[in-house]
Amino acid sequence: MATDFKRYYEFKDDLDEVIFHRHDMPSPWMNYLTNGTFFTMISQAGGSLSWYRSPEIWRIGRYNFYNLPTDGNGLFIYIKDKKTGKVWNPTVIPCNAIPDEWYSAHGFGYTRFHAVKDGVTVDLNCFVGTENALIYDMNISAETQREISVFACREMGLMEYLREVQWQCYCKASNNILYDEKTDSLSYEYFVDAQPRPDETPKVFFAANMRSVSHDGSRKSFMGSYRDFENPISLERGACGNSDLKGGEALFAMQFDLTLTNKPQNLSVFLGTYGQTESVKPLLDKLREKNYAEKEFKRVKNRLSERKKYFSAEIPDKDMQRMANVFNPLQAYVNFLVCREISFYATGTVRGIGMRDAAQDVLANVLYDLPASEEKILLLLGQQYNCGKTNHYFYPVEKREPLVSDRSDNHLWLVYAAYKVICECGKTDFLNKTAPYFDGGEGTVLEHIEKSVGYTVDHLGEHGLPLMLGSDWNDMLSNVCKEGKGESVFVSQMLVLACKQLKEIYAIIGKDDKTPDEIIARQEKILNDFCWNEDRFIRAVSDEGLKIGNRDEKCGALWINSQSWAVISGCSDEEKLRKCMETAVSTLDCGYGLLKLYPPLQRNYPSKEHELTFAQPGVNENGGVFCHANTWAIIAECMLKNNNEAYKIYKELIPHNIVKKFGVEKYNAEPYIYSSNIRAPMALDAGQAGVSWLSGTASWMMIALEEYIFGVKPCYKGLKIQPCIPDEWEKATVKRFFRGCEYTIELDNSAGCGNSVKEVYLNGRRFDGEYILSSAPTASVRIVTGKK
């Protein structure tokens, strides 16, 4: 039943966790554990994969994305009762012996398991602390004295996933696992020829804070023949084979013997990396310090509290509050670090860093970590050419050639990112920093973003709209410009917004240049004269001159982006803007978000030679609920002061709410973070979500919530507060850290008019200005809604 989600999971808001009551979810429900250099993704059932900096070239262990059993690889802990011989796992998998009592939980940067079986209790905390190591910290106890063995194992593979798939027959001769008696640790070394960065490839260690009694480095020695992780031969024998490995199938395994009482015993297992020329001993000494794991776990758990100091909200809608304070910030943080490289849906092999993806991820991170955001923008600018275009994907860690594919939108996102920095810090210093051009030379940040605008202006089509080039944000439109003539309405709207931001920057720095005004005027005229179609803006113009998104077309007659971005860019008059969004919402709202387009594209549309779709009707980009695009619709509704409509769309898209509508099994993906897309009502398996975690939805949903629904928007001159909360809320409280001051903002909506501001009070005194900026460490703001 759709309402029976509590059999699967529930939220513990006092702990800021999601609790899982069973291990066998319809798909692995992941979490990310990281210190920014060492990463692990881990599921509710303990399946996991770790990597150091890059999952493409420094992967630690195997993870079989498409094989059965699903989620069948990870760092596994086995509990064996020496008397009875029974074996089980606190994660349930891989032995699948169901504990008498069990749950797992994901929090911000950690995952934990609680399991009780046959009188033995295990509490396991999984996290990555300050050092580059995954820590499995266990407290184990028993009702009566018990003798047990704990086996910990992690199958290793070649660090380069694609090389392993293609050349493992030869390359697996170039690895080893050796045991060191002095440090009681296993070390893995990968030294295959022609690695991308061989001098920086780390060694991997496996150890614990307790002396082992046996170990293995050979998979065959630990597993035996024709067995899997459910029944390794070493567990039957009661000991590992004490094997080393010099070429072959690698695996870390260690055995620890414990005598249990009702007083918990601690065992911490470590899987981490260290430098090629370094000794592992100093790192192990640190990890093995008394109470080290306990202290590090507390520090990791405190990360969310530190993040909440920058932004948090207290509102009547607790599902929305949870997303605002915990899981949306978590997802946005992971996207900033990982981009779109690796998840349960992405194998981490060829994606690298995407220009448009990373530039949008920055937008939500500026609030939390301005220096890291500036550094990321400079990295992205280094992929721009002197002409203004950018590489599409690039590989700063892997050091291989970028994907040059010329997309019409990539470079414009850089303008928004640089503008965001200026608005957050209130300084223009960043504009004067320099970044190289990919094809030689260097320029200031300002010069780079000017070239971004210039490149679009230099590539206009027959009708004066920007050429689609390889595609715009919507990859499905790649065939629109196959012959070099197709044009993008969406990019025209992006250009208008970029020029408005550039114009504001010019005003701030005192640069007298009317170029942005001229571009805005030309593009707005074309958008209104040529692209307006009764009650909507068309989406694109094909090579043949077909207006894609024309209301009379049998497919794709309405696209959400060219309506929402008309509002976001402010490219037309209020009447048209209201009309196009009214058309979009009334046509596209399916009850769990807005469809990306309607009707879905069909095969051979508009012709066999120029077919647009690569997905089934109602699936993914072809008329599914594409969550990223919905964030812009929410922003547009707020800009039009349609507060209740904005709230409705936001609520519909909360994953937990969709689960309550369709049920856990049908929704399939995690109910605590956003997926990229959800199947539309007309599709088979309607309501099924796909491609979770890594999505631009994370960044833009935070912006939609913080800056538009709550209305707390950073501007160069200060905070501009224009809430657009639902009329039904009586009040809301937002905390926002801005330029050294912690603002507590009370939104008083007693009047039930959540889209307008009647009065503003700063520290108890009436404030009539437009921008709020305090030099004190704290400030209180009270916004009274209502008509003036």
Region roles according to the model:
Residues 1-357, 371, 376-380, 420-424, ...:
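Anionic coordination/interaction segments
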Residues 263, 353, 357-358, 362-464, ...:
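Aromatic-rich carbohydrate-recognition surfaces in CAZymes
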Residues 314-329, 368, 377-389, 413, ...:
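Active-site acid/base region of carbohydrate-active enzymes
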Residues 714-745:
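Surface beta-strand/loop "capping" patches
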